[in-house]
């Protein structure tokens, strides 16, 4: 089983790819898709589309986990929702099963509390993946936490 966790955004889309092999969780790749602030929004969305397609074609995940987005009154809300729509479209076009999790669900599953801190989440990601140093940048660590939430739901604790 191979899963991609995705932390949506317009400026940065975090991703983390984990494989289960002999009941061990193995980190295959993590990072961010960054779009330049100097580009037009439609070009940034297209960049997410292209880069995510490349990642999926390279790693062939069998499932995906994406952070749910809740409406907040913010000038970036619409942009993030549009980026999330592009992400969901790419996953649907590849026939990848998608699970969605709220930030509180992710925190509860990974760190044992729906109000866990960023450090608690990072520590849990490092522990679960047997990492010596934290994944960078933070968006990729968040994406790994999202993927680990899905794996936990599927019984890979």
Swiss-Prot record:
This is Crossover junction endodeoxyribonuclease RuvC. InterPro entries: RNaseH-like_sf, RNaseH_sf, X-over_junc_endoDNase_RuvC. Belongs to the RuvC family. The gene is ruvC. It holds the Pfam family RuvC. The active site is at 7, 67, 139. It catalyses: Endonucleolytic cleavage at a junction such as a reciprocal single-stranded crossover between two homologous DNA duplexes (Holliday junction). Gene3D superfamilies: Ribonuclease H-like superfamily/Ribonuclease H. GO terms for cellular component: cytoplasm; Holliday junction resolvase complex. It is found in: Cytoplasm. Its EC number is 3.1.21.10. Homodimer which binds Holliday junction (HJ) DNA. The HJ becomes 2-fold symmetrical on binding to RuvC with unstacked arms; it has a different conformation from HJ DNA in complex with RuvA. In the full resolvosome a probable DNA-RuvA(4)-RuvB(12)-RuvC(2) complex forms which resolves the HJ. GO terms for biological process: DNA recombination; DNA repair. The RuvA-RuvB-RuvC complex processes Holliday junction (HJ) DNA during genetic recombination and DNA repair. Endonuclease that resolves HJ intermediates. Cleaves cruciform DNA by making single-stranded nicks across the HJ at symmetrical positions within the homologous arms, yielding a 5'-phosphate and a 3'-hydroxyl group; requires a central core of homology in the junction. The consensus cleavage sequence is 5'-(A/T)TT(C/G)-3'. Cleavage occurs on the 3'-side of the TT dinucleotide at the point of strand exchange. Mg(2+) 1 binds at residues 7, 139. Binds 2 Mg(2+) ion per subunit. Keywords: Cytoplasm, DNA damage, DNA recombination, DNA repair, DNA-binding, Endonuclease, Hydrolase, Magnesium, Metal-binding, Nuclease. Its cofactor is Mg(2+). It comes from Prochlorococcus marinus (strain MIT 9301). Its main location: cytoplasm.
């Amino acid at each position: 089983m191979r899963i991609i966790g995705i932390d949506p955004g317009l400026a940065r889309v975090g991703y983390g790819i984990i494989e289960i092999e002999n009941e061990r969780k193995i980190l295959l790749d993590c990072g961010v898709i960054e779009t330049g602030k100097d580009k037009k929004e439609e070009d940034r969305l297209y960049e997410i589309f292209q880069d995510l397609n490349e990642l999926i074609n390279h790693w062939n995940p069998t499932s995906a986990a994406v952070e749910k987005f809740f409406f907040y009154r913010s000038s970036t809300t619409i942009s993030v929702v549009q980026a999330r729509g592009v992400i969901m479209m790419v996953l649907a076009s590849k026939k990848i099963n998608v699970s969605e999790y709220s930030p509180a669900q992710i925190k509860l599953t990974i760190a044992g509390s729906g109000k866990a801190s960023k450090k608690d989440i990072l520590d849990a990601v490092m522990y679960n993946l047997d990492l010596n140093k934290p994944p960078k940048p933070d968006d990729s660590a968040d994406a790994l936490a999202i993927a680990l939430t899905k794996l936990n739901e599927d019984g890979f604790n």
